[in-house]
Swiss-Prot record:
Record-given protein name: Spectrin alpha chain, non-erythrocytic 1
Spectrin repeat segments: 1-5, 7-14, 15-20, 21-26, 27-35, 39-46
Record's subunit section: Associates with the gamma-tubulin complex in brain, but not in kidney, liver, sperm, or uterus. Like erythrocyte spectrin, the spectrin-like proteins are capable of forming dimers which can further associate to tetramers. Interacts with isoform 1 of ACP1. Interacts with CALM and EMD. Interacts (via C-terminal spectrin repeats) with TRPC4. Identified in a complex with ACTN4, CASK, IQGAP1, MAGI2, NPHS1 and SPTBN1. Interacts with CLN3; this interaction regulates the fodrin localization at the plasma membrane.
Family note: Belongs to the spectrin family.
Annotated function: Fodrin, which seems to be involved in secretion, interacts with calmodulin in a calcium-dependent manner and is thus candidate for the calcium-dependent movement of the cytoskeleton at the membrane.
GO molecular function: actin binding; calmodulin binding
Keyword set, alphabetical order: Actin capping, Actin-binding, Calcium, Calmodulin-binding, Cytoplasm, Cytoskeleton, Repeat
Keyword Cell division in record: no
A GO biological process held by the record: actin filament capping
Length: 46
């Protein structure tokens, strides 16, 4: 039972890590997108 438990824990942590990595990636893309938008606004403002 203990081996199975630790295996499930590993699976759980792995999915959690993958999930947060995915979130971080999405956040980074979001930030990149806004930087581009900001650049556009700045070029138009000049």
């Amino acid at each position: 039972a203990q081996l199975a438990d630790s295996f499930h824990l590993q699976q759980f942590f792995r999915s959690q890590l993958l999930g947060s990595a995915h979130e971080v990636q999405r956040l980074a893309q979001f930030v990149e997108h806004w930087k581009k938008v900001e650049d556009l606004f700045l070029t138009f403002a000049k």
